[in-house]
């Protein structure tokens, strides 16, 4: 896809507004065969006013249905430190959905979780939830704040999941805070082609970017060891001015940059429309696309096949870290800065 009105003469410049339109509408709906025609026109998408999502409404209903005893276990002040935590395999409260909530409440939780995802992708998410942990009943839920009284957020956690529903309570923060998703398909140690892993398509798209790089660019983009997985610290953002390793997107050719747009589209594909658009706006808010750098990591290459299992996109306002060895872990944090 090309932006006919924003070429700088060298074919490198991609207009910021066009970037949002391309990825939010075309980058997910048109360049990804898994989800054709998912969105309306870009003008409608970007102009649409914020509306209370069904998941937010259900989260409020869930809160109001809690007994006093239940609230003591799963309801917290909005500024409680648990709300900002993220990890790859953890229980935000010591009680699980299946053992603690009534059948009606369990049904609401399932519907809230479904509503956080693209309806064209949610069955894949539930497939990995079932394979990884035996279903949503094994996960845990916490509620922060009170609906109707200001900021309010629903958080669901468990193996390979930290998901949030916040209704824009956290200004300038995509998804309501850092999130995690992942999948161990068929075994803990996946094969090089990651058979039936529902998120491996994202790495395949990222490797298309690497294949499009010239030799000099590859030397800059291909690094040794990736960041360590350390819970919330994994997605700590760099300060503006700190060095971000990898190949800056601003130094890529136009065709390469368009491939990065497709990567972003595929990364956002699993999520509901409101979160996709919010994430793109937050990425773009302070020079986002030009601020991104992309890196690949050779020291965690399953099968030594030079199809890079571990890679990331990073800027001062974003970390999207895909660690595909020994199976897929994906860490995400997108936050604008004042």
Task: Kindly label every feature range from the protein language model.
Residues 7-9, 25-27, 38, 180:
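Intrinsically disordered, low-complexity segments enriched in small/polar residues
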């Amino acid at each position: 896809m090309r932006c006919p009105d924003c070429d700088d003469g060298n074919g490198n410049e991609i207009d910021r507004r066009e970037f949002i339109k391309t990825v939010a509408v075309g980058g997910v709906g048109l360049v990804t065969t898994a989800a054709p025609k998912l969105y309306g026109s870009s003008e409608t998408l970007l102009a649409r006013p914020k509306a209370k999502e069904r998941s937010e409404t259900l989260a409020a209903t869930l809160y109001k249905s809690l007994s006093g005893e239940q609230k003591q276990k799963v309801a917290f002040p909005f500024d409680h430190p648990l709300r900002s935590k993220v990890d790859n395999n953890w229980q935000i409260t010591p009680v699980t959905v299946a053992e603690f909530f009534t059948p009606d409440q369990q049904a609401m939780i399932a519907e809230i979780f479904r509503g956080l995802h693209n309806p064209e992708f949610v069955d894949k998410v539930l497939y990995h939830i079932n394979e990884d942990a035996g279903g949503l009943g094994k996960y845990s839920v916490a509620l922060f704040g009170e609906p109707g009284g200001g900021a309010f957020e629903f958080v669901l956690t468990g193996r390979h999941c930290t998901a949030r529903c916040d209704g824009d309570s956290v200004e300038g923060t995509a998804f309501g805070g850092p999130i995690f998703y992942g999948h161990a398909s068929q075994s803990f140690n996946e094969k090089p082609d990651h058979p039936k892993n529902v998120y491996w398509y994202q790495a395949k798209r990222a490797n298309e970017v690497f294949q499009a790089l010239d030799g000099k660019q590859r030397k800059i983009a291909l690094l040794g060891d990736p960041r360590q997985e350390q819970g919330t610290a994994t997605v700590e953002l760099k300060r503006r001015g700190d060095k971000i390793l990898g190949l800056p997107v601003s130094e890529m050719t136009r065709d390469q940059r368009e491939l990065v747009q497709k990567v972003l589209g595929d990364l956002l594909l699993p999520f509901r429309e409101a979160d996709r658009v919010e994430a793109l706006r937050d990425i773009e808010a302070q020079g986002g696309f030009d601020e991104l750098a992309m890196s690949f990591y050779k020291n965690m290459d399953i099968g030594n096949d030079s199809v890079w299992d571990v890679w990331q996109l990073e800027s001062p306002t974003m970390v999207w870290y895909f660690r595909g060895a020994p199976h897929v872990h994906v860490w995400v944090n997108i936050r604008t800065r004042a």
